[in-house]
Structure formats: C-alpha cells, structure tokens
UniProtKB/Swiss-Prot annotation:
Responsible for the release of ribosomes from messenger RNA at the termination of protein biosynthesis. May increase the efficiency of translation by recycling ribosomes from one round of translation to another. Its main location: cytoplasm. This is Ribosome-recycling factor. The lineage of its organism: Bacteria, Bacillati, Cyanobacteriota, Cyanophyceae, Synechococcales. One of its GO terms (biological process) is translational termination.
Length: 182
C-alpha cells in the first residue's frame, strides 16, 4: 500500500466520521440532521433527500417540501418515528419541523455520541495502519525491503496516522463546541 493510498483511505475514514458528526444536533436547525431518515415510499425504503427539498428558513426551523405531495404523510410518519424526537407540522404542502433548543442533559448526551463516533473513526484509522504495517512486514520478509527501509516505512505510516488522528480530534473539539454553545 503506497503512502498516497494509505492517506486516501484515512481521508475517507475521517470524512465518514465527519458525516456522522453532521447527523448530531447542535443548537441550530440543520437539514443534515435528517440525512439518515428513510421513508416508506411505494413499498421501498427511500432516503428522505431523494423525496423532498430540505431547507432551513431560520435557525430554529427545518422545512421539507416533497416533490410528490402523496409522499407527505409517509415523510411525516418517518420523521415522527425517528429517534430525533422532532414533531413535524404538516400544512398539506410543506412539513415544518421546529427544532427546540437543547437541554443541558441532551447536550451532554450528544457530546458523548460525538466522542463515540470519533472513537469509531480512530479505530478505523488504526485498522488501516495495522494493515499497512502488515504489508510492509510481509514485503520485508520477501526481501523487497531491508530492515531499515521497513522501519522507515513503518515510521511514515505512524506519522500519517498521527496526522489524521489529530485532524479527527480537531473535528471532535469543533463539534463539541457547537453542541455546547447555547
């Protein structure tokens, strides 16, 4: 595995963790909160994003305008059944969700969830490091690398890991600051 391949894989892990962070509520309304909601539409589970336009007209409201009005009831039901705890308001054409301010207890829960996502991201990064080091050791056994080259390559892999873990920690700190901001 080349350094570029390793960095690309690690970048994808960090981006996946960032997408997970985006699904966590902060004090403001954000349409990405609804990214994981699937709607029963003509017998198939369909992502909400492909059934409606999502917007945030103000900091406390998410607005959902379905492309097909017949999907309105299904969308409303899916949002009400989700673990987000939102109560959708349906006016016959548009669904509005008022995002209430977070309580201190909920903020702490969301910080714990963000930490959990960050830890999962770190585990994924460490697994990539382990795979890369195993390949290097295998190449050393096969005679492609000398012992010194192998050690240098392993040090490079570790430095790459450290860089991406620091980036992940920075994203986590930023998300926690967003969550805790009143």
């Amino acid at each position: 595995m080349s350094t570029q391949d390793l960095e690309a894989s690690m970048r994808k892990s960090v981006e996946a963790t960032q997408r997970n962070f985006n699904t966590i509520r902060t004090g403001r309304a954000n349409s990405s909160l609804l990214d994981r909601i699937s709607v029963e539409y003509y017998g198939a589970e369909t992502p909400l994003k492909s059934l409606a336009t999502l917007s945030t007209p103000d900091s406390q409201t998410i607005q959902i305008q379905p492309f097909d009005i017949s999907a309105l009831a299904s969308i409303e039901k899916a949002i009400a059944m989700s673990e987000l705890g939102f109560t959708p308001n349906n006016d016959g054409k548009i669904i509005r969700i008022n995002v209430p301010p977070l309580t201190e207890e909920r903020r702490k829960e969301f910080c714990k969830l963000a930490s959990k996502y960050a830890e999962e991201g770190k585990v994924a990064l460490r697994n990539l490091r382990r795979d890369a080091i195993d390949k290097i050791k295998k190449q050393e056994k096969e005679g492609e690398f000398s012992e010194d080259q192998s050690r240098d390559e392993q040090d490079g892999v570790q430095k790459t890991l450290d860089k991406f873990i620091a980036e992940l920690e920075k994203h986590l700190a930023s998300k926690e600051a967003d969550i805790l901001k009143v």
